[in-house]
Regions:
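Beta-sheet-rich non-transmembrane sensory/scaffold domains
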Residues: 1-172
Length: 172
């Protein structure tokens, strides 16, 4: 998505391969830039900032869904924001000037993480969520089904107005 107001280009990225992080990155880590929004200078490609919504992604939760630009009043101040609902089941609001995490709320039943920590902007994974750590996480299939049903039945262009209303009501 190109932001003419800020002259920034936002790119949603995919997941890594192989999906199993223990094979892809045996030493662990976030696998930076997987399942992220990366902001670049469109003139020369200079990296500006990124936000990773699924650190160490291992469930095919890519982040290349619609990136909606909006100006929202948050805590009495109008902020330039990104509205984004990737495959991990959370709806994100980010400051598009610098990638600062503002909020995230589940838009479908999420079984791999309990919530997104408001201080760090990182999902709080539930025990056993990573299939490479033990038995298969059967609920992840339920999660994917819920996300596909809730997220992909209509394009964001027709949904974002109701989502903005939800944000407005939550923020007062």
């Amino acid at each position: 998505t190109y932001d003419a107001e800020l002259d920034q280009l936002y790119i949603g990225t995919g997941n890594g391969s192989p999906w199993n992080r223990k094979i892809r990155s045996p030493e662990g880590g976030d696998n930076l830039f997987l399942s992220s929004i990366v902001a670049l200078d469109p003139d020369d490609g200079t990296y500006l900032w990124h936000y990773q919504d699924s650190p160490g992604e291992t469930w095919d939760f890519n982040s290349n869904m619609d990136i909606v630009l909006a100006d929202l009043e948050i805590d009495g101040e109008v902020r330039n924001v990104i509205l984004h609902a990737p495959k991990n089941g959370f709806f994100y609001v980010l400051d598009r000037t610098n990638g600062e995490f503002i909020s995230a709320e589940a838009f479908a039943e999420v079984t791999w993480a309990s919530h997104v920590d408001p201080e760090t902007g990182r999902p709080v994974e539930v025990p056993g969520a990573r299939y490479e750590d033990g038995e298969a996480f059967v609920e992840s299939f339920s999660l994917l089904e819920n996300i596909v049903r809730e997220r992909f039945r209509t394009p964001a262009e027709t949904e974002h107005y109701s989502v903005v209303e939800v944000i407005r009501y939550r923020d007062g």
